[in-house]
Amino acid sequence: MGQGASTQTLNPNLAYITDDEVDHSMPESDGANPGAGNPSAKSKGKFPSLGKIFKPWKWRKKKTSDKFKETSEGLVLERKMSVRKPREELIERGLLKDIPENESNDVNHKAPPVKNGHTGPVPGDRKSDSGSEIDQDRRMDDTGERKEKRKRIGKRNDGTERMTEMIQSFQKMSLMQRSVGVQFVPEPKPASTSTKESQPPPKQAILPPKRVIAAPSSAEPAPVPPPPIAKPPPRTVSLNVDDSSRTILIPSLIAGDREVPPTVPAHTTPATVSTHKTLPTVPAHMTPPTVPAHVTTPAAPAHSNPPAVLLKQPPMPPPKPVHHSSNTALQGLDLSTVDPSQVPVPVKRSPPIPPKRNTPVTKRNSGDSSANLPEPPPPAPTSVPIPAAAPISAPPSTQSDPPSPTTEPPSQPPPLPLHIRIQRALNSPGPVHPNPEGSQRAHSLLFETPPDLINEALGGGRYSLPVTIEPLRLPEDDDFDMEEELQKLRAGPRPTQKPELEPRSRRGLVEDPQVAVIPEDAGSESSEEEEDESDSDQSIKYRDDNEEDDDEEDVPKSGLASRVKRKDTLALKLERQQEKEKSQEEDSSTWNNKEQWEAVRNKIGTALTRRLSQRPTAQELEQRNILLAKNEEVRRAERSEIKRRLTRKLSQRPTIADLQARKILRFHEYVESTHAQDYDRRADKPWTKLTPADKAAIRKELNEFKSSEMEVHEESRIFTRFHRP
């Protein structure tokens, strides 16, 4: 197609369509003029619709008029467009991805490759372009890009493609919570690579640091830098270490604000910043589709990387930040590179791996995990050189949220980032000096290994948890001895190689003594912040995560019901929290002597008796016909008593004369009252029921009467029918 890069929306929701797409994505008849509500060509006159009223067989549910539909859809679209997120925020959240197109029209258009309407870097022979030519190309490519977008939007009807895009966007959004922010500096490019610039960039491995790399002599000098532009928001990248047995999920680190390096014109190759901090991370595969091009992926991918994507890219103005792997605006950390002989062949991007939530398990030797690289690097040194000459490359500060472009820079230099300290702690078994400002407990749990574990690890033995099996004795057993149990409890813990763990920490030993899991309390504040951010634009969920959703039904509820349910769930949650606290207190109350044991026993006994006292009594159950009477004779006697009482009442009924005398019944003179024989009006007597033989006899008699005695008109005789029994 064209040379412009397409911005492809991963979310099919119209609220997230970018500026360029909104103009052309809506067809003119449906949503081009939303507020106006002009009728479409299909809308009919008034009189045909009047005719429908007088057809009673067509009085079904009236179809909503096209005019009304158009107006309502237009209003919805207008409202969605008014609350639409800006483009750079969508790119930062990963809902927009930039797809560079193949230059298929290379013969017709000889313009330089563009990215979002801006010229990209060109090969070394075009270094004399002026700024006006760049602007002209930019304008021309903008219009060309819009035309291409119109064609693409018309063609984008393939459902499977949209499904894959949605899946990728969900994976990306789930990975946004735990991601590592890394800012990249342009790689030092030797002059010999100018011939390869039309090919896709080699994805180099992120290796443990070897040394601070100086600029090679073949790099061309940088021009005089123009004034810096506004810094686009930093992008987040998640690093996963793929190993056969374990997965390391690096904690969420976002690079802090720092000064933006000067922009470089498109026709020049930027020189290398000589003194920069090397990034000591383990070799990683990038999970989301927003992968930097530096990462090597051995798997053969599903879609190939298009050409004309270069390692260096000029910085963009802030409204449209280029969401690309090698943006020069994202500088500050230089990746330690390999020699030109070690640079792998350009590989295609691997399909996105779904995020895994695993216990962070690390290895003793960090070099083990780099087995899939072209050449295994030596183990990383314990200290990372921090140059004093480069003020730009301040280490990123650990934050729980990516800073916005308007965030103020921190007043004091931020501490060392967490992943660097983890790397140091893994490489050097010795104690690391704790962070003065941070949480002491979390730091000690992360970086200070118990000495007996270090000795065990140095000895080369594999540490396993001691398992003791001891029969449990209950107070009901015959050989239960209180004094013996108390002595067992008072006796100190046996000297094992287990380190002393804090009572509620989640630190455990998983096959390897150098594993340290961060306890609950250390990460509580950041997790609360993340919860607040994630719940800010959704409904409040008062339920616990581990709670069963059995009572949740799919029945749509009214507004009042949902309000009442919200209050009820809040009250229930508070009740459950109190119950949990109580149960924790009860669990913690263990008995150490006989008095305490008696107290616990009495407590349980009172709770049980209270429960039993709330049970209904046998009398109540008998009254409610749940519990039957003791035996059949008593029940028969009760029944006969009830019968006798009722018959006495019926036998004492007053006669009509009595009622007339007592002026309860008043008859007029002309009403005759005769005494009739009293009979039982109840119809459930067996002698009142007709047997099948009786019914057959009645039918036979009736049919005989019809056939012989009943008069039938001659013309209707053909319609008569006599049923034989």
Swiss-Prot record:
Write down the PROSITE patterns for this protein, in alphabetical order: RPEL
Instruction: Cite the record's Low complexity compositional bias ranges.
Output: 212-221, 265-276, 292-313, 385-401
Q: GO:BP terms for this protein? A: actin cytoskeleton organization; closure of optic fissure; enteric nervous system development; negative regulation of integrin-mediated signaling pathway; neural crest cell migration; neural tube closure; positive regulation of catalytic activity; regulation of cell cycle
GO cellular component terms? cytoplasm; lamellipodium
Where it sits in the cell: the answer is: Cytoplasm; Cell projection, Lamellipodium
Residue ranges with Acidic residues bias: 522-536, 545-554
For whether the record's keyword set contains Cytoplasm, the answer is: yes
Would the keyword Transport be found if you checked this record's keyword annotation?
A: no
The UniProt regions of compositional bias labelled Basic residues, in chain numbering, are 55-64
Q: Where is the composition biased (Polar residues)?
A: 1-12, 166-177, 359-368
Specify residue ranges for compositional bias: Basic and acidic residues.
65-100, 124-147, 155-164, 497-510, 567-585
RPEL repeat start-end pairs: 75-100, 606-631, 644-669
Q: Where is the composition biased (Pro residues)?
A: 222-235, 374-384, 402-417
Q: What does this protein do?
A: Regulator of protein phosphatase 1 (PP1) required for neural tube and optic fissure closure, and enteric neural crest cell (ENCCs) migration during development. Acts as an activator of PP1. During neural tube closure, localizes to the ventral neural tube and activates PP1, leading to down-regulate cell proliferation within cranial neural tissue and the neural retina. Also acts as a regulator of migration of enteric neural crest cells (ENCCs) by activating PP1, leading to repression of the integrin signaling through the rho/rock pathway.
Q: Which family does it belong to?
A: Belongs to the phosphatase and actin regulator family.
Entry protein name = Phosphatase and actin regulator 4A
- Species for this entry: Danio rerio (Zebrafish)
